[in-house]
Structures are given as structure tokens and as C-alpha cells.
Amino acid sequence: MSFFTTEFVNFKNRCVWSWNGFVHVCKTEASMRQWIIANIISGFFTFVAPISYTEQAILLAAGILILAAECMNTAIERVVDDISHEVRSAAQQAKDAASAAVAITATAAGVTWLVILLGVYL
């Protein structure tokens, strides 16, 4: 196979694997479904709010980053649970840190909304 054919096949495989992972998280994690609904609502408001295209892009990206953080959180939970189901402090700390990453990302998105809206309405 040529270089470009090989790279195309690799790219296609990565897309399929990524999609499969996203679908798995959506099917198994209620919090992911809740974040998707929040992103749909947030996305709607980005297009009706009197804000610039740049601000729209920033807000949409912030929402997408929450979804990425939720995927990473789920991946960490799966690996920790796969290693052992016994209660271990390091395992709990890893899971808590992954959850905190989602919370911090969501807080950053909320602060972004707040700053942009304050700029519009003040």
C-alpha cells in the first residue's frame, strides 16, 4: 500500500474507534447524556444571544471540552474497575481526580458564559 492509502486507513480506523468510544460513553453514562442535553441547550443560546462569532465558538468549544473530560473520566473509571474491584485508596483518588476534571471543565465553561454575558449586558 502507498503511504497515503495507509494513512487514510489509519485515519479511518481512528475515527471508527473514537466514534465507538463516544457511543459507549453515551450509552453507559447518564452524566454524558445530561452534558449532551446541556450542550444542545447551550448551543441554541449561543446562536440566539447577541454575541460575536468568536464568542459563539469559545462557548461551543467549552461545551465540547466538557464532553471530552467526561469521556476521559469514564475511561479512567473503566481501567480502575478493570484492574480490581477491591476498595483501594489510590484507585478512589484516581476516580475522584477524573471526576474533578469534569467539574473543573464545567466550571470553566460556566465562567466563560458568565463573562461573555456580563460583557453583553453591562
Segments (PLM) and residue ranges:
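Short basic (Lys/Arg) and small-residue
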Residues: A94
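Hydrophobic alpha-helical transmembrane segments
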Residues: M1-R78, I83, V87-A90, S99-L122
